[in-house]
UniProtKB/Swiss-Prot annotation:
Biological process per Gene Ontology, one example term: microtubule-based process
InterPro entries (UniProt xref): Alpha_tubulin, Tub_FtsZ_C, Tubulin, Tubulin/FtsZ-like_C, Tubulin/FtsZ_2-layer-sand-dom, Tubulin/FtsZ_GTPase_sf, Tubulin_C, Tubulin_CS
Residues annotated as binding Mg(2+): 71
Organism classification: Eukaryota, Viridiplantae, Chlorophyta, core chlorophytes, Chlorophyceae
EC number in record: 3.6.5.-
Record text on subunit structure and interactions: Dimer of alpha and beta chains. A typical microtubule is a hollow water-filled tube with an outer diameter of 25 nm and an inner diameter of 15 nM. Alpha-beta heterodimers associate head-to-tail to form protofilaments running lengthwise along the microtubule wall with the beta-tubulin subunit facing the microtubule plus end conferring a structural polarity. Microtubules usually have 13 protofilaments but different protofilament numbers can be found in some organisms and specialized cells.
PANTHER family, alphabetized: TUBULIN
Modified residues (N6-acetyllysine): 40
Catalysis: reaction(s): GTP + H2O = GDP + phosphate + H(+)
Catalytic machinery residues: 254
Keyword GTP-binding in annotation: yes
Subcellular location: Cytoplasm, Cytoskeleton
Name this protein carries in UniProt: Tubulin alpha-2 chain
Swiss-Prot/TrEMBL cofactor(s): Mg(2+)
Amino acid sequence: MREVISIHIGQAGIQVGNACWELYCLEHGIQPDGQMPSDKTIGGGDDAFNTFFSETGAGKHVPRCIFLDLEPTVVDEVRTGTYRQLFHPEQLISGKEDAANNFARGHYTIGKEIVDLALDRIRKLADNCTGLQGFLVFNAVGGGTGSGLGSLLLERLSVDYGKKSKLGFTVYPSPQVSTAVVEPYNSVLSTHSLLEHTDVAVMLDNEAIYDICRRSLDIERPTYTNLNRLIAQVISSLTASLRFDGALNVDITEFQTNLVPYPRIHFMLSSYAPIISAEKAYHEQLSVAEITNAAFEPASMMVKCDPLHGKYMACCLMYRGDVVPKDVNASVATIKTKRTIQFVDWCPTGFKCGINYQPPTVVPGVDLAKVQRAVCMISNSTAIGEIFSRLDHKFDLMYAKRAFVHWYVGEGMEEGEFSEAREDLAALEKDFEEVGAESAEGAGEGEGEEY
């Protein structure tokens, strides 16, 4: 088996995790107490879902995951929520005091007390696997726990499980909507270790997903639950091929191979289509070509970033539901002819497609319509660079005055770490510029003229 362990860190990670496991359980017909009624074995007795669930002798299905937070309230919601019987109590780890939006508290003082316990639990989960293929890490980089403890845990995972791939689903601070003043600090410090210790990081931001909810689902005042359920659909589509059988299945390591041209450039845009409310879906026939086009719309992106400002380096399309390879090939051919969607000239093909026959499931009572087919796109575009330049700019404004820095230094950080992380991101911005620049020969000539 190719198992995957999910790690949910901090409030954002845990709440996204709740939405994901809720959806997985629905997709596999697993009840909130972990039982799977035998008449409803969805894969016809096939055990592909064991990549995400382990089965006990009593026939209970336990998620291969761990929830980790430095303060108890969010984890307590899981402990008392609908799915409290699904998780093993040891999988829910919470500390006593908060990271207080402070990267240094999450990474140095409070985080290091809990990280060994977490690694111990992860070790138990890993021993329970026959062929662990990697980790999915869910966190946000604006707060203290997700950024500080998140990067600490990733660093430790690199030491303990060097060869296993790590996929991050990371909520980045939005351009306009902010939940903390020190977000730019936390994000820059955290991205510094994401660069080093994740293989692929899918970027999400709340503002972009709010806009999608308002625009496509007609929700006037979206809540975090609405956002998380949308994110869960994306993650479910990505992992569907690990959990079901299909015509073109995609492994976790395949993502890396196809999406990451250079190790540092592994920050991805994601989008999902069709996002459509139940009332509208009744009147629309969503063909493969239509949903493929929708996935490339700038408005479908799950992070505030306009792909028209950059070029695509690679792109992964994961279809699910009633889709055949012929339709996919036709849609991709159409996309290639569009002038607006530009690829870098050193990457001529640029598309990786996956097809899975399990149609998308929706959580009952939720705003998304039940559709026959859906597509999730993960793409590597040079436009992602603008997210980092936006962050860096905010970081610089604060750091020039050394505002709020004493909170970090007081928790045992050194000021040098700020400048080190900032330089690393400056280098990343430069990497994005160079990758998007004209072709290989052009670069060579330019250098010749300069010297």
